[in-house]
């Protein structure tokens, strides 16, 4: 058990019988009485984010997880297949368990598989991934005057905003935490 005041970004806890990753945790004190710990939690299985306020002093169970290096192999229907690099064993995760990570997975990519009690429950992506632009509007002289960017569709189906100089077929780096353009690959 861990006290909610000690929660830090990146920790895993069990709340309502589900495993959550702590995205944010901040302490708020009232004028009188005890304070609150406001958290933003992401469900590891479904990817849904929820905000939860805990009274300070409350304790929550910490999830016992293990991480193993794996390679993304392929997608078949609504299942994604991975091979752990230490024992070459294959594991399948459903689209629900993968969540938004599906927009960043490219075949043969190395990721960390998240295991709980020996069963894979999710995937941890690298901070940035390289993806190819498959569809975007052509650039015209004078586009950059207004600033901003233009919409683009990437090889995984992810839709993001990219600078005007990016063309169809370009490889770009995308931040997996925010889904934003980082730079050219």
UniProtKB/Swiss-Prot annotation:
Molecular functions per Gene Ontology: translation elongation factor activity
SMART domains: EFP, Elong-fact-P_C
Organism: Thermotoga neapolitana (strain ATCC 49049 / DSM 4359 / NBRC 107923 / NS-E)
Primary localisation category: cytoplasm
Function (record text): Involved in peptide bond synthesis. Stimulates efficient translation and peptide-bond synthesis on native or reconstituted 70S ribosomes in vitro. Probably functions indirectly by altering the affinity of the ribosome for aminoacyl-tRNA, thus increasing their reactivity as acceptors for peptidyl transferase.
Compartments reported by the entry: Cytoplasm
Keywords: Cytoplasm, Elongation factor, Protein biosynthesis
Pathway linked to the protein: Protein biosynthesis; polypeptide chain elongation
Protein's recorded name: Elongation factor P
Record-stated family: Belongs to the elongation factor P family.
GO biological-process terms attached to the record: peptide biosynthetic process
GO cellular component assignments: cytoplasm
UniProt key word Protein biosynthesis: yes
InterPro entries in UniProt: Elong-fact-P_C, NA-bd_OB-fold, Rib_uL2_dom2, Transl_elong_fac_P/YeiP, Transl_elong_KOW-like, Transl_elong_P/YeiP_cen, Transl_elong_P/YeiP_CS, Transl_elongation_fac_P
Annotated HAMAP family: EF_P
Coiled coil recorded as keyword: no
SUPFAM superfamilies referenced in this protein's UniProt entry, alphabetically: Nucleic acid-binding proteins, Translation proteins SH3-like domain
